[in-house]
């Protein structure tokens, strides 16, 4: 069974995204929720939205009596053609999901990722046959992509995501139906998202707090027990790989303006406000980090930088 969903529970808090449920072998189920990081409510927690999704009457019966086997989270690139970066640099190419070749309108990306890798391989063979010693920026990789079927496929889907963000699920859905099914993505204009994700949060004065129900330990769970299933490990003596440009900013700026959203957008409980009597302290539990990189994207003050930790550290997912 394959289930794709949109709307609830994210729509209740004016957020967008989608959900999936796939039946696997050995009576296993893969379930997940994709949350667009342009949401505006600082009290929203993607992790807790996933827990809510599991309570849907169409989903809960599938999970009845099941055992939670694994958990993970990752920031994904789904902006499509509008968000593709320069895909070549000296000595390397960006391919697949590292570049962002997902066809969002079809919710498919394996074939486009493979094609981008094949084009990169063809480019490498070309330059090796030409006697290239390496280390150059081979920008004609981009030309190869534009001459393949990959570029027109991504171009035909370029308006899908921006239409949903600009017009909402109903008008945006109608727009996309006409664009994708009648016009085959050949509209003479391109919609774009002009607001970066970290600038999308409303301040607390203009936001409604969200009271998530406590997990029942059967169908819904807490972050800590979920992170345990990621088999995450970092050496205790290694430097913290989550850097703050200003250590005072979380309490002085983010807390009063946005209720410090790092406590909620992080799916692993890395960031927390610790109360110590009358004082408060911003704590980074770097050992919990599952390397999703959401903090580097969503922090409204752009105060957090995720850097590569020591080799071997991080999650070790099973069955994912």
Where are these regions (language model features)?
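Iron-sulfur cluster-binding cysteine motifs and their immediate structural context
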Residues: 256-287, 293-318
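Glycine-rich, charged/polar anion/phosphate-binding loops
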Residues: 4-7, 15-19, 76-83, 205, ...
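Conserved FAD/dinucleotide-binding core of flavoprotein oxidoreductases
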Residues: 3-5, 11-75, 111, 130, ...
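FAD-binding beta-loop-beta segment adjacent to the flavin cofactor pocket
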Residues: 73-104, 225-241, 249-265, 272
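Mid-to-C-terminal Rossmann-like scaffold of FAD/NAD(P)H-dependent oxidoreductases
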Residues: 134-242, 248-250
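Extended, non-globular alpha-helical segments
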Residues: 72-86, 90, 144-147, 163-174, ...
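Active-site-proximal substrate-binding core of FAD-dependent oxidoreductases
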Residues: 100-106, 112, 118, 122-169, ...
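Short, glycine-/Ser/Thr-/acidic-enriched flexible segments
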Residues: 26-27, 36-38, 99-101, 109, ...
